[in-house]
């Protein structure tokens, strides 16, 4: 006699058949196999380690042909996917805010300059950040290093924005050894210097005279050592290197005695020390059993600062500009989970793309975010699929001022507030830039447009462009002219008009820039530590 079906109670001939618990188990296995995290080939969501360098130039790594020795980074890049058409923002705060929100700075109110020490400003508190989304997906989230996304209120701090732990500094730059940052205080008619180093939300006062890259590497490797491999990890390691001030232990400069320019020589040592630090982090991932299920990402936040040893040759411009030298990012992905390795990707990508890419890879959801400007790039990176991104807004800043003018210049060129009839879609006196496929349009004053050859390797320190200083519109075919030497706006007026129309669209859909006056209440005189003051 047949047995009773547990589902219906009816007689079923031919033996026992599958029971309900077994069916549920098979269904769970099927759902697991179809999840985004399984798409990488991992048995669980992958660990994500994101290393962000500060002010690292295009010509500052070995795999871009630099004389600076970076064997660990070179090896990781050679075994991974080099992002050769990858863009960041010209300055610290804009890149970091777009990395963690997946949204353009025109949608955050952060399109003008960066967050100053005493400004009552931070990434809007109603924005959901990458670590919050990864926590919801079951990740442990840790941050080490530079924040620079605002700290005037405790609600702005990393530990209030999704990170389980934080060790680092909150402002834009500081001394590598004393960990003190200096900023203007209006009531002093001068500057105040105070400690800017925290463990969680408490001041970390016991690290004086210890080089910051070494401190941050030690904390990162400790996080890795203490992390259970079965739980997914997100580690955001934002090095101080290689932002000024130019400081490094003497032994790291010794291999670069052939570099005559002192700034470049110190800078080279700083890059080499950072390269060694990256090697120590990847060594820790391997020795503690995490590497085989890790996606390791390396990126700069903006182009190199040529006034402080950095170099972007042969690209035009530098940090703070919309020229390629300011925004074309050095970056790569290394991971055993990549389906293609040892390749160079020419697919268009932007720093806003990391949030949707990593959240999807983690099996998480972006449903709680505001509309994203980033795209999921994992199949592009891992498998070589075409990029879903064809357009990229570099920025629109109608209040732009040139804080880093060309050598011998001391002001931003005067604006012409008229709307030339042939370019009526957008006011071309406004500082703006947009990319569509291979085309890049710039308007207004993009920043210093010189080319800067590597120091000590050329008879000239800079090469100025030829053309009127009042020029406010350029079009380049970046695929054919990555050095931005040939303006082709006159040859392609229809492309100019289309891109100006797109700039006007973005301009109309942007939020007002939030750049409040400095608040004298920020003064850390009473505590000696830069801290929230509101």
From Swiss-Prot:
It catalyses: Hydrolysis of the 4-sulfate groups of the N-acetyl-D-galactosamine 4-sulfate units of chondroitin sulfate and dermatan sulfate. It is found in: Lysosome; Cell surface. GO terms for molecular function: arylsulfatase activity; metal ion binding; N-acetylgalactosamine-4-sulfatase activity; N-acetylgalactosamine-6-sulfatase activity. Homodimer. Inhibited by ethanol. Residues 1-41 form the signal peptide. Removes sulfate groups from chondroitin-4-sulfate (C4S) and regulates its degradation. Involved in the regulation of cell adhesion, cell migration and invasion in colonic epithelium. In the central nervous system, is a regulator of neurite outgrowth and neuronal plasticity, acting through the control of sulfate glycosaminoglycans and neurocan levels. Substrate binds at residues 146, 243, 319. The modification 3-oxoalanine (Cys) is found at residue 92. The conversion to 3-oxoalanine (also known as C-formylglycine, FGly), of a serine or cysteine residue in prokaryotes and of a cysteine residue in eukaryotes, is critical for catalytic activity. Keywords: Calcium, Disulfide bond, Glycoprotein, Hydrolase, Lysosome, Metal-binding, Signal. Binds 1 Ca(2+) ion per subunit. This is Arylsulfatase B. PROSITE patterns: SULFATASE_1 (PS00523), SULFATASE_2 (PS00149). Its cofactor is Ca(2+). It is an enzyme of class 3 (hydrolase). GO terms for cellular component: cell surface; lysosome.
């Amino acid at each position: 006699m047949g047995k009773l079906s547990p589902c219906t109670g009816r007689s079923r001939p031919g033996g026992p058949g599958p029971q309900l618990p077994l069916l549920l188990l098979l269904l769970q296995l099927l759902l697991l196999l179809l999840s985004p995290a399984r798409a990488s080939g991992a048995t669980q969501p992958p660990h994500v380690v994101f290393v962000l360098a500060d002010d690292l130039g295009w010509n500052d790594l070995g795999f871009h042909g630099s004389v600076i020795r970076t064997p660990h980074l070179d090896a990781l890049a050679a075994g991974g996917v080099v992002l050769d058409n990858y863009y960041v923002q010209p300055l610290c705060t804009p890149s970091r805010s777009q990395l963690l929100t997946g949204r353009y700075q025109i949608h955050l109110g952060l399109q003008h300059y960066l967050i100053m020490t005493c400004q009552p400003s931070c990434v809007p508190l109603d924005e959901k950040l990458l670590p919050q989304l990864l926590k919801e997906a079951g990740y442990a989230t840790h941050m080490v290093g530079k924040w620079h996304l605002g700290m005037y209120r405790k609600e702005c701090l990393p530990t209030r924005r999704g990170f389980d732990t934080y060790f680092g500094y909150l402002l834009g730059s500081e001394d590598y050894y004393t960990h003190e940052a200096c900023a203007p205080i209006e009531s002093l008619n001068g500057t105040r210097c105070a400690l800017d180093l925290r463990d969680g939300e408490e001041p970390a006062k016991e690290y004086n005279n210890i080089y910051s890259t070494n401190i941050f590497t030690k904390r990162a490797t400790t996080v890795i050592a203490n992390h259970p491999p079965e739980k997914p990890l997100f580690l955001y390691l934002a090095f101080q290197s290689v932002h000024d001030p130019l400081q490094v232990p003497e032994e790291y400069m010794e291999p670069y005695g052939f570099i005559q320019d002192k700034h470049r020589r110190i800078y080279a040592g700083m890059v080499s020390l950072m390269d060694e630090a990256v090697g120590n982090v990847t060594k820790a991932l391997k020795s503690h059993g995490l590497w085989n299920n890790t996606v390791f990402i390396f990126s700069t936040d903006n182009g190199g600062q040529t006034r402080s040893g950095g170099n972007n040759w042969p690209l035009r411009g530098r940090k703070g500009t919309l020229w390629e030298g300011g925004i074309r990012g050095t970056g790569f992905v290394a991971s055993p989970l990549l389906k293609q390795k040892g390749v160079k990707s020419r697919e268009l990508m932007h720093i806003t793309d990391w949030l949707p890419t990593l959240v999807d890879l983690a099996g998480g959801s972006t449903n709680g975010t505001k509309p994203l400007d980033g795209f999921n790039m994992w199949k592009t990176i891992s498998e070589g699929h075409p990029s879903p991104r064809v357009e990229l807004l570099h920025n629109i800043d109608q209040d732009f001022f040139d804080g880093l003018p060309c050598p011998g210049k001391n002001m931003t060129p005067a604006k012409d507030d008229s709307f030339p009839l042939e370019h009526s879609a957008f006011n071309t006196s406004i500082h703006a830039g947009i990319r569509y496929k291979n085309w890049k349009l710039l308007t207004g004053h993009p920043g210093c447009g010189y080319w800067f050859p590597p120091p000590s390797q050329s008879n000239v320190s800079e090469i100025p462009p030829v053309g009127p200083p009042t020029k406010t519109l350029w079009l380049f075919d970046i695929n054919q002219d990555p050095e931005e030497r040939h303006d082709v706006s006159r040859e392609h007026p229809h492309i100019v008009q289309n891109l100006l129309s797109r700039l006007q669209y973005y301009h109309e859909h942007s939020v007002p820039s939030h750049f409040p006056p400095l608040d004298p209440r920020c003064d850390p005189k009473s505590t000696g530590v830069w801290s929230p003051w509101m």
